[in-house]
UniProtKB/Swiss-Prot annotation:
The active site is at D11, D130. GO terms for molecular function: imidazoleglycerol-phosphate synthase activity; lyase activity. Its EC number is 4.3.2.10. SUPFAM superfamilies: Ribulose-phoshate binding barrel. The gene is hisF. CDD domains: HisF. This is Imidazole glycerol phosphate synthase subunit HisF. It comes from Rhodopseudomonas palustris (strain BisA53).
Length: 255
């Protein structure tokens, strides 16, 4: 069985972490590279950077962040946000990203997923899905543009389609749960994870360590992504992993 992964996520705007980080030993809580180094030392399996910079002109700042992080850290790095072209992917991979996450651009043009997977390999193409339950129904709709724009597209159908086109992994965020600290949307997570043959990363709603276990055991995800429970020093990566091991999940634990 694959080892379950624990993945912290950093939102970066204009080269700075925006949600804030409260690590004890960080000299500069707003510097994403400092935060990445701390997570690497703490035993994170991977790290996800989400570039929420509004302007394309500041893209160079993010590339510098990726470069400096890749030089300083051993863990795999996924970068997403504003990825619209094959050239965007190439530049990020050359800067040191191991995987690139695409979201709105894949919804707008599905062929983009196929082109990216054929050029760079399925293993480094992640499709990020932001989904929200359709009121009164047992189905979920895809949203784009940072969750602001509904599409009417069914989340399960879309997940299956992008995987058939070459997505090697799905990063699934429940918009209903994001920021609530009430736990993952288990029906959504399991519905997607059970419908595709690639790894699914559960995201949105983690408030305690049991939620991480539930994402895997009940949601059938292969990895869990969280932000605030780690950023603010509430729990360490090691505490999360040890709790998951005690729950019977296969984890990579550094000595």
């Amino acid at each position: 069985m694959f080892k379950v992964r624990v993945i912290p996520c950093l939102d970066v705007k204009d080269g700075r972490v925006v949600k804030g980080i409260n690590f004890v030993d960080l000299r500069d809580a707003g510097d994403p590279v400092e935060a990445a180094i701390a997570y690497d030392a703490a035993g994170a399996d991977e790290l996800t950077f989400l570039d929420i910079t509004a302007t394309h002109e500041n893209r160079g700042i993010m590339l510098d962040v990726v470069r400096r992080t890749a030089e300083a850290c051993f863990m795999p790095l996924t970068v997403g946000g504003g990825v619209r072209t094959v050239d965007d992917i190439k530049t990020l991979l050359r800067s040191g990203a191991d995987k690139v996450s695409i979201n709105s651009a894949a919804v707008a043009r599905r062929e983009f997923v196929k082109e990216a997977a054929e050029k760079f390999g399925e293993q480094c193409i992640v499709v990020a899905i932001d989904a929200k339950r359709v009121p009164g129904k047992d189905r979920w709709e895809i949203f784009t543009h940072g969750g602001r724009k509904g599409t009417g597209i069914d989340a399960i159908d879309y997940a299956q389609e992008v995987v058939s086109l070459g997505a090697g992994e799905i990063l699934l965020t429940s918009m209903d749960r994001d920021g609530t600290r009430q736990g993952f949307d288990i029906p959504l997570t399991s519905a997607i994870a059970d419908s595709v043959p690639v790894p699914v990363i559960a995201s949105g709603g983690v408030g305690n360590l049991d939620h991480l276990v539930e994402g895997i055991a009940k949601g059938h995800a292969t990895a869990v992504l969280a932000a605030s429970i780690f950023h603010f020093g509430e729990f360490t990566i090691r505490q999360a992993k040890e709790h998951m091991v005690r729950s019977g999940l296969p984890m990579r634990l550094d000595p």
